[in-house]
Amino acid sequence: MSMIAAFYGGKSILITGATGFMGKVLMEKLFRTSPDLKVVYILVRPKQGQTLQQRVFQILDSKLFEKVKEVCPNVHEKIRAISADLNQNDFAISKEDMKELLSHTNIIFHCAATVRFDDHLRHAVQLNVTATQQLLLMASQMPKLEAFIHISTAFSNCNLKHIDEVVYPCPVEPKKIIDSMEWLDDAIIDEITPKLIGDWPNTYTYTKALGEVVVQQEGGNLNIAIIRPSIMGATWQEPFPGWVDNLNGPSGLIIAAGKGFLRSIRATPMAVADLIPADTVVNLTLAVGWYTAVHRPKSTLVYHCTSGNLNPCNWGKMGLQVLATFEKIPFERAFRRPNADFTTNNITTHYWNAVSHRAPAIIYDFYLRLTGRKPRMTKLMNRLLRTLSMLEYFVNRSWEWSTYNTEMLMSELSPEDQRVFNFDVRQLNWLEYIENYVLGVKKYLLKEDMAGIPEAKQHLKRLRNIHYLFNTALFLIAWRLLIARSQVARNVWFFIVSFCYKFLSYFRASSTLNV
């Protein structure tokens, strides 16, 4: 019997960010392994035209929860959706709901965050720092609370090369940042943002670092742990390989490359692609929740959930495997044939952006205008290039994350728990995982039927032929213009033609003599 699964039986659990990618995988694992848990509270932002119960059914109406419905048929009755807005004071939770949360909650998994790299600092501080502070205040009023698990990111201290499992201080105290966001206007915040974030590449990583400091400073006597996952990708094993439902992380790049939009990216092929499957993160999270509640560590422990130190895979190897998978399971209606390359400097990056990204988009939009349709490709391509520029920092560097606490926790688990809640990334086969990832993107994100693969392959063959014809025509036109304008080019052309004619004449004469 799994000790971790038994621990969550009968518990009342609060999950923030339950409608997000990790939140859904976390709920699925909880209900599948501990169907006898009491209730899962989820904070849900109200949507016009949808009741809270409809939001619950919308979450459960996914292939992800198929196994859960078999082991826990009344799962919809065990999910208690509470209307909340993390942008508001006290999350705009009603008095009745707040009373219920404070009275019954045993475990908190704080997964909610804004993950937009280009988010305005005010909004990023509100969701990643202030909301964490308010949730800690709520937690301090929960008499039955056993553990508070805060999900951060392995890149919260990406301004360092080597990162230990500790909370690092920030140059400016979080309280000062929170206070300043309340009275500064947007124009001033925009002006001071670069100075505030300093060596951090964006507001996301900076505010996640601030959030960790808040957890450490204001946790009081709570049993708290911090988990730092790296780049979260599709599921590895549970509940099945390849499940993904958002465009964050590599998923958006896989679609852009598979559809032929992404042709070049500035990245270091030998840099470590620190990708971590979502189910690995969830297994570690549940194990940490159990350990924190049962063993009650004296200080806040930080757990790194990364792959680079234990089972590294670089961007070059990953890119080749993704392209190889496209040959077997191509995406439908591709814009161009998948063929993405790495560049390593600004000059080649700008060149390929102009030639392989912007130029085809402009040509296609011109064609759309001629046929009376609305142009859209240039706008889409500009959005892709903005995304690539925000990712450059992360795909051109490698980090070293210590994993002492994570390995310690693994050694504390029984063989049964190590099997049921497996977070040992050393067992991960990258080639198999990436193939399942691409397949998952096709099935669960793009909603493409596997029966359409033969037609998708035929479409790629047509695109290949068009590519060859276009390049040949372009070469002939360029050469013709060059011959018309340059005596040197004409001389070279006549020399080549003369040489070929003489060679063919010699070959014909030799063949006649042999006969």
From Swiss-Prot:
Belongs to the fatty acyl-CoA reductase family. It holds the Pfam family Sterile. It is found in: Peroxisome membrane. One of its GO terms (biological process) is long-chain fatty-acyl-CoA metabolic process. Residues 1-465 are cytoplasmic. GO terms for molecular function: alcohol-forming long-chain fatty acyl-CoA reductase activity; alcohol-forming very long-chain fatty acyl-CoA reductase activity. The chain crosses the membrane at residues 466-484. InterPro entries: FAR, FAR_C, Far_NAD-bd, NAD(P)-bd_dom_sf. It is a single-pass membrane protein. Its EC number is 1.2.1.84. The keyword NADP applies. The gene is FAR2. Gene3D superfamilies: NAD(P)-binding Rossmann-like Domain. Residues 485-515 are peroxisomal. Keywords: Lipid biosynthesis, Lipid metabolism, Membrane, NADP, Oxidoreductase, Peroxisome, Transmembrane, Transmembrane helix. Catalyzes the reduction of saturated but not unsaturated C16 or C18 fatty acyl-CoA to fatty alcohols (FAls). A lower activity can be observed with shorter fatty acyl-CoA substrates. Can produce very long-chain and ultra long-chain FAls, regardless of whether they have a straight or branched chain. Involved in the production of ether lipids/plasmalogens and wax monoesters whose synthesis requires FAls as substrates. It comes from the Eukaryota. The keyword Transferase does not apply. It catalyses: a long-chain fatty acyl-CoA + 2 NADPH + 2 H(+) = a long-chain primary fatty alcohol + 2 NADP(+) + CoA; hexadecanoyl-CoA + 2 NADPH + 2 H(+) = hexadecan-1-ol + 2 NADP(+) + CoA; octadecanoyl-CoA + 2 NADPH + 2 H(+) = octadecan-1-ol + 2 NADP(+) + CoA; a very long-chain fatty acyl-CoA + 2 NADPH + 2 H(+) = a very long-chain primary fatty alcohol + 2 NADP(+) + CoA. Its main location: membrane. This is Fatty acyl-CoA reductase 2. GO terms for cellular component: peroxisomal membrane; peroxisome.
